[in-house]
Amino acid sequence: MVTSLNEDNESVTVEWIENGDTKGKEIDLESIFSLNPDLVPDEDIEPSPETPPPPTSSAKVNKIVKNRRTVASIKNEPPPRDNRVVGSARARPSQLPEQSSSAQQNARRKSNCVKEVEKLQEKREKRRLQQQELREKRAQDVDATNPNYEIMCMIRDFRGSLDYRPLTTADPIDEHRICVCVRKRPLNKKETQMKDLDVITIPSKDVVMVHEPKQKVDLTRYLENQTFRFDYAFDDSAPNEMVYRFTARPLVETIFERGMATCFAYGQTGSGKTHTMGGDFSGKNQDCSKGIYALAARDVFLMLKKPNYKKLELQVNATFFEIYSGKVFDLLNRKTKLRVLEDGKQQVQVVGLQEREVKCVEDVLKLIDIGNSCRTSGQTSANAHSSRSHAVFQIILRRKGKLHGKFSLIDLAGNERGADTSSADRQTRLEGAEINKSLLAHKECIRALGRNKPHTPFRASKLTQVLRDSFIGENSRTCMIATISPGMASCENTLNTLRYANRVKELTVDPTAAGDVRPIMHHPPNQIDDLEAQWGVGSSPQRDDLKLLCEQNEEEVSPQLFTFHEAVSQMVEMEEQVVEDHRAVFQESIRWLEDEKALLEMTEEVDYDVDSYATQLEAILEQKIDILTELRDKVKSFRAALQEEEQASKQINPKRPRAL
């Protein structure tokens, strides 16, 4: 039964009952007319003047020819030569139905569904052809043999949608008390040979994007794009001169205004810290003239020639020392070990540190070259010439012997070594512990500087203790250059570096606009008691600073890690004390030898005083026993501290569990 007539697509909808179920179907009119010729309506077709009149069954033939041409145009295929209909007077009308009978049946029996399927198939073929052309074009631009080819294509497509506005020398230099910037280095030869991918994008002068590869449960790979914002962002094409122009150069004038300036490079081993601070490397040889050390010295001597500073008669001195495993060594004095003490005025003094007077940039370059040749370094998986210590180069201005200003340029050790606190090698553990502690303390000191806090936890590490005067005072300025590696293999360390730098910069905003900000240095008495009970430490200045430092970084420092840091600090203090006492005993032993030699010479006399000899010898022996016993007890305590450090290193949890 026909239920409806669809004039739009020239079809009818029919329904029937089969086994008690109502079923329906859509049938086009052409199929109905071909199966039921008696239903074809009688229409008078006017003959065209250009074509001969149709044969007897004009309606049928016209429809057949029309439909056959329609099908041919859809398939874009010419009909067979034998089935062509020639519009000529010579064509025999009797052969027309025979030639088109097969096409008539096929064309009229195609439903709308079949036609739609054919259209979809045609579109699908066009789409596949376009995708194939696109793949061929991509294969010309990128290396399809790369194992991370899929990630590489996703990164390239994402970068294609960005609007690039990189930092240029024409951009203005903003005034910051704390300036944080990021520098990206290019891929090195090793990363290129390993076909590592560049996952760092710097689209503008203050934005850094990290394309972190991730994998879903079904093993589908995708990108997680993380964005960070800083004061300045330098891409891999920025030279040292450009980095210096926006970072350390604005700080040079600070030291002429009786201020303290600090510029330090922070990042993973091999990310370009020493290259930025010291200069270009050619193998193990370094061109010191292109580093921030030399560029800052050049501007210092240029400023000295200005009339308003020339009349001050300032003297320029320089020091260069390193901090390795909590110990300070003078790089300009054959790596002599130095002691860091605090005088009665609470001023930190580096005992024995040599200051060299410099008259020109060439003198500075010589000192840098001497210091770099002595600096502690080693070969790692990331870098063939890896720095394992914090190097501090200071340009000091003095007026008539008194301190006028100081510029501290610091090349920090690789931040990834801070994860080596659970290593089986004690020396590696000490390196990691000192780096970990000094970086946390350095961050908190900058936070205190940015918030104008009255207390700075500089005693928490040897690095911040030496740089105490750079974090105190209204005329103190700091610049941080976070260097990052672009390779996908370094993605985790790069994110850690950027998070550290981002946390430092967050603290420079107005605390009233920063939302919920907890006070970090002033705890009520009961809270101090709670902290002492929780961390189990006494009340010495160094331990208090270390305790508060760990409390402010509770998500990064577990109680076990704090215990380890405490054990390391105690062990280092005891080591210094034991070595100092041993040196004193050695000097005393020389005096004992002289006294004993005099006693023995006295016994060679004929009538020497036996009572005097015995009394003096007994006194010498008692003094020896007392001093050596005291030294032995300290050595035993020192060995116990070594055991405690080893036990504490085995119980470290990297992160403190969050409160539920």
UniProtKB/Swiss-Prot annotation:
<protein>
    <recommendedName>
        <fullName>Kinesin-like protein KIF2A</fullName>
    </recommendedName>
</protein>
<dbReference type="GO" id="GO:0008017">
    <property type="term" value="F:microtubule binding"/>
</dbReference>
<keyword id="KW-0505">Motor protein</keyword>
<dbReference type="GO" id="GO:0005737">
    <property type="term" value="C:cytoplasm"/>
</dbReference>
<keyword id="KW-0221">Differentiation</keyword>
<dbReference type="GO" id="GO:0051301">
    <property type="term" value="P:cell division"/>
</dbReference>
<feature type="modified residue" description="N6-acetyllysine">
    <location>
        <position position="75"/>
    </location>
</feature>
<dbReference type="GO" id="GO:0030154">
    <property type="term" value="P:cell differentiation"/>
</dbReference>
<keyword id="KW-0206">Cytoskeleton</keyword>
<dbReference type="GO" id="GO:0005524">
    <property type="term" value="F:ATP binding"/>
</dbReference>
<dbReference type="Pfam" id="PF00225">
    <property type="entry name" value="Kinesin"/>
</dbReference>
<keyword id="KW-0217">Developmental protein</keyword>
<feature type="region of interest" description="Disordered">
    <location>
        <begin position="1"/>
        <end position="140"/>
    </location>
</feature>
<feature type="modified residue" description="Phosphoserine">
    <location>
        <position position="73"/>
    </location>
</feature>
<dbReference type="GO" id="GO:0005813">
    <property type="term" value="C:centrosome"/>
</dbReference>
<dbReference type="Pfam" id="PF22923">
    <property type="entry name" value="KIF2A-like_1st"/>
</dbReference>
<keyword id="KW-0132">Cell division</keyword>
<feature type="modified residue" description="Phosphothreonine">
    <location>
        <position position="70"/>
    </location>
</feature>
<dbReference type="InterPro" id="IPR036961">
    <property type="entry name" value="Kinesin_motor_dom_sf"/>
</dbReference>
<keyword id="KW-0524">Neurogenesis</keyword>
<dbReference type="InterPro" id="IPR027640">
    <property type="entry name" value="Kinesin-like_fam"/>
</dbReference>
<dbReference type="GO" id="GO:0016887">
    <property type="term" value="F:ATP hydrolysis activity"/>
</dbReference>
<keyword id="KW-0131">Cell cycle</keyword>
<keyword id="KW-0067">ATP-binding</keyword>
<feature type="region of interest" description="Globular">
    <location>
        <begin position="1"/>
        <end position="171"/>
    </location>
</feature>
<keyword id="KW-0498">Mitosis</keyword>
<keyword id="KW-0175">Coiled coil</keyword>
<dbReference type="GO" id="GO:0007052">
    <property type="term" value="P:mitotic spindle organization"/>
</dbReference>
<keyword id="KW-0493">Microtubule</keyword>
<comment type="similarity">
    <text>Belongs to the TRAFAC class myosin-kinesin ATPase superfamily. Kinesin family. MCAK/KIF2 subfamily.</text>
</comment>
<feature type="modified residue" description="Phosphothreonine">
    <location>
        <position position="51"/>
    </location>
</feature>
<feature type="coiled-coil region">
    <location>
        <begin position="614"/>
        <end position="653"/>
    </location>
</feature>
<dbReference type="GO" id="GO:0005871">
    <property type="term" value="C:kinesin complex"/>
</dbReference>
<dbReference type="InterPro" id="IPR054473">
    <property type="entry name" value="KIF2A-like_N"/>
</dbReference>
<keyword id="KW-0007">Acetylation</keyword>
<dbReference type="InterPro" id="IPR001752">
    <property type="entry name" value="Kinesin_motor_dom"/>
</dbReference>
<dbReference type="GO" id="GO:0003777">
    <property type="term" value="F:microtubule motor activity"/>
</dbReference>
<keyword id="KW-0547">Nucleotide-binding</keyword>
<feature type="binding site">
    <location>
        <begin position="267"/>
        <end position="274"/>
    </location>
    <ligand>
        <name>ATP</name>
    </ligand>
</feature>
<dbReference type="InterPro" id="IPR027417">
    <property type="entry name" value="P-loop_NTPase"/>
</dbReference>
<feature type="domain" description="Kinesin motor">
    <location>
        <begin position="177"/>
        <end position="507"/>
    </location>
</feature>
<dbReference type="GO" id="GO:0005874">
    <property type="term" value="C:microtubule"/>
</dbReference>
